[in-house]
Design a protein with these regions (language model features):
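Glycine-rich phosphate/adenosyl-contacting loop at the front of the ribokinase-like
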Residues: 1-58, 250, 316-319
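Anion (oxyanion) recognition and catalysis
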Residues: 51, 76, 174, 216
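Conserved phosphate-binding/catalytic region of the ribokinase-like
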Residues: 212-319
Length: 319
């Protein structure tokens, strides 16, 4: 292990622009609130959650334009150090319009009765990344590995990057002796898993008991496959399934994917048992699912829900 800092990489970071509206409808003109700006992208969320739990983190990736400046400024306000490689293009933006019942600030609601209003989302595709910009990022990334305890690679790739980009980043980390957690899907995952990431986190819309084992055969040290708030993990030592009973969940919005990935990192570094890793990660994911209207709070997790649900997570070994 080279250092003490957990480096998160978000190659398609986003600036979330949030508005509160009196009513969401299909016709007419409606007043909206002053916009709220927040840095986003799954790797950014992972960095926020880890920082909230006291871990030393560094958020890296690609950022450009006014949106890129606002991304870095927002992370600085959260106490998250950054080392983004600057690009000429404008970092992507998402626009979210929250109806009645969603706090204008996007902060975590104090009570569940405020989790009412609908949210409309619109998202830009993101910038085109040139070969020169990728080369500069790769050089920056390799320098960061010297002080990294682990690297977390997350999310989609922006236009211009080859599909094997994550594979190269996994290889660089392995050469530096730094463990890698990869959270990706589609072609990005397909081209990276053979490079031997220590842990792969993959998402599927339906239960696929064979996916984790397949990822292991392709080269992953361990594979965690998520379906909503259920996680199946396959490792060299065996497999486990973790879930939270519906009776304990209460109000559930969309699972906190970034929070779940963040929850798997400490156990990977500290050698926790897999049941303990899964309890921590799934309780965090459920806490992240309680953010009002899908507008994530400052630390992207409801800590009270996390503490309550930690003992409710059921982990069962696979036969």
């Amino acid at each position: 292990m080279s250092g003490d800092v957990i480096v998160t990489v978000t190659l398609n970071a986003a600036l979330h622009v949030d508005y509160a509206v009196g009513e969401v409808g299909t016709e007419g003109t409606r007043p909206i609130s002053k916009p709220g700006y927040r840095a986003g992208g799954r790797g950014v969320t992972v960095a926020r959650v880890l920082r909230a739990f006291g871990h030393d983190v560094l958020a890296a990736g690609l950022a450009g334009g006014v949106s890129g400046e606002l991304i870095r400024e927002d992370l600085a306000k959260s106490g998250v150090p950054t080392a983004f490689t600057l690009i000429r293009g404008e970092s992507r933006r998402t626009f979210r319009f929250a109806g009645p019942g969603v706090p204008e600030t996007g902060e975590v609601a104090a009570d569940q009765d405020r989790l009412a209003g609908p949210v409309l989302r619109f998202g830009e595709a993101g910038p085109y990344i040139t070969t020169e910009e990728l080369g500069r990022f790769a050089a920056d990334y390799r320098r960061l590995l010297a002080g990294a305890a682990a690297v977390v690679l997350c999310g989609s790739l922006p236009d211009g990057l080859p599909t094997d980009t994550y594979g190269s980043l996994v290889t660089y980390a392995a050469e530096a002796g730094v463990p890698v957690i990869l959270d990706a899907g589609g072609e990005e995952l397909k081209h990276a898993v053979g490079h031997g990431p220590d842990l792969v986190v993959a998402e599927t819309s339906s239960a696929d008991p064979g996916l984790g084992a397949a990822l292991r055969r392709l080269g992953a040290g361990a594979a965690a496959v998520t379906t909503g708030l259920e996680v199946r993990v396959v490792t060299a030592a065996g497999g486990w399934t973790a879930q939270i009973p519906a009776a304990d969940l209460g109000v559930v919005l969309s699972p906190g994917r970034g929070a779940l990935v963040a929850g798997l990192v400490p156990g990977q570094l500290l050698g926790w048992s897999w049941p303990d890793r899964l309890k921590h990660a799934l309780a965090l994911a459920a806490g992240g699912a309680r953010v009002p209207g899908g507008l994530e709070g400052r630390d992207h997790v409801d800590l009270a829900a996390y503490e309550r649900l930690l003992d409710a997570v059921q982990v069962v070994p696979e036969p």
